[in-house]
């Protein structure tokens, strides 16, 4: 039994045929967590779809109308790069509801994971790059609307820049957006995040971890979040079909541990979303995502009693952020 909740619904798994986006990974992660003895049925919660009012805090009414009435133009559907269907829209609203619920549970338990989500390319008035609506932004805006938090941080380690995240939160001093990504990769127009880490092709474990540690240290020095949304893409993996970095599975596990340590040391609730992952073997992508959940479990174990260790419902006392141990850099 895990010390936090996992959010999942079988509808996350769309039948996309031989599309490069492996939507079956959500089901496979769920099954591996269960059958591997990492989680049991009581650890999982099924979300409700996001309400339209939640989606409309992030996306324009015209875009939402087009999505719900199947009236996107041919060009807009091409920009999504994923087959449009009513099932797709239902799954996206459900994933957004999953990230809302994950945020609520993280504030209660210290940690949570949406076994899905992380659709960081979705912009206010359009979707792109397999991302229809921006579940993380929707969750942050809902938590702010509920006055559960004021300040949030997005740590995006997907190999692709979080352009939708950057566009949605541009100029918002209450949301700190950090994106570490391959520079010469999609998207080709990259609006500025609060902190962008542009990596050249071929960066491997040691260099990546050193750079990420340096920037996380600076980010937590500059900003004191009340919740972290961790967009934990599996695609920096060296065998990823859509990436050009060279991280090993062990390097990705160290990445996860590093991010978790910053959350733990700063007593900040953290939400995992899975984001991208397109390894030649889907089993590799699944293993990386499962490893992220394991990293959260291990970090929660170091924290002791999660509810006692974390600031709940956004009532955060003044403090100086603390870096994790040097051995993780």
Where are these regions (language model features)?
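A general "terminal functional-core" signal
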Residues: 74-329
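Metal-dependent C-N hydrolase catalytic cores
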Residues: 2-137
């Amino acid at each position: 039994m895990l010390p936090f909740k996992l959010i999942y619904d079988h509808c996350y798994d769309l039948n996309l045929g031989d599309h490069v986006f492996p939507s079956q990974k959500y089901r496979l992660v769920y099954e591996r967590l269960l059958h591997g003895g990492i989680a049991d049925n009581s650890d999982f919660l099924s979300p409700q779809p996001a309400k339209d009012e939640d989606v409309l805090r992030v996306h324009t009414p015209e875009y939402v109308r087009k999505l719900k009435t199947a009236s996107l133009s041919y060009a807009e559907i091409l920009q999504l790069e994923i087959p449009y269907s009513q099932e797709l829209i239902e799954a996206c609203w459900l994933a957004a509801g999953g990230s809302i619920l994950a945020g609520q549970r993280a504030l209660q338990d210290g940690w949570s994971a949406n076994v899905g989500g992380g659709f960081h390319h979705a912009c206010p008035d359009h979707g792109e790059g397999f991302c229809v609506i921006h579940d993380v932004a929707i969750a942050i805006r809902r938590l702010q609307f509920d006055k559960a938090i004021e300040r949030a941080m997005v740590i995006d380690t997907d190999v692709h820049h979080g352009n939708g995240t950057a566009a949605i939160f541009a100029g918002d001093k209450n949301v700190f957006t950090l994106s570490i990504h391959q520079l010469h990769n999609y998207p080709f127009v990259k609006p500025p995040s609060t902190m962008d880490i542009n990596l050249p092709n071929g960066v491997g474990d040691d260099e990546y971890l050193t750079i990420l540690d340096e920037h996380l240290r600076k980010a937590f020095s500059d900003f004191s979040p009340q919740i972290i949304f961790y967009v934990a893409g599996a695609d920096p993996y060296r065998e990823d079909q859509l990436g050009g970095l060279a991280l090993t599975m062990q390097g990705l596990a160290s990445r996860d541990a590093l991010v978790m340590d910053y959350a733990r040391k700063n007593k900040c609730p953290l939400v995992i979303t899975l984001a991208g992952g397109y390894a030649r073997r889907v089993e590799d992508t699944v293993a990386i995502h499962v490893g992220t959940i394991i990293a959260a479990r291990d970090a929660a174990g170091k924290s002791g009693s999660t509810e006692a260790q974390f600031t709940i419902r956004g009532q955060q006392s003044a403090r100086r952020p603390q870096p994790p141990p040097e051995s993780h850099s």
